[in-house]
């Protein structure tokens, strides 16, 4: 894949998040509840930021809806800005390679290997014996939304993990009690 194709893939993934008005004093929902969460991807080995003040470039189906916008910023590989013509070897699943996902669908070369993701993960865990499960923090949001009241739903059990989080605080239970992509009211 080219750097440009990878950028479009990330533009599609950025649809997971709502557009945020940094000047609003009203609570704003971070997660776009109409976006299928299985279409959100993190691409490891790269670093990047999302500018949530911009609208989504693609709709939930991968249709281009805002051609002249970009949410992907500071896209880099090994600390250097990505050359959009640079080529990368990317390994992903057949859902992405055979679908209509922006960027991925335009890749010049696609090989379907007879491998199953689950078995590959099992084999890796068995061979490594110890797995570092911590996130490497390779992506983030631009700080231009830092003063907005941004909210998202999570399990009440997550409260126990907030002690070391300066940027996240508990604001209360969800009124509807519904989860898993169903609209909610904080």
Label each PLM-derived region with a short phrase:
Residues 1-186:
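Catalytic centers of hydrolytic enzymes
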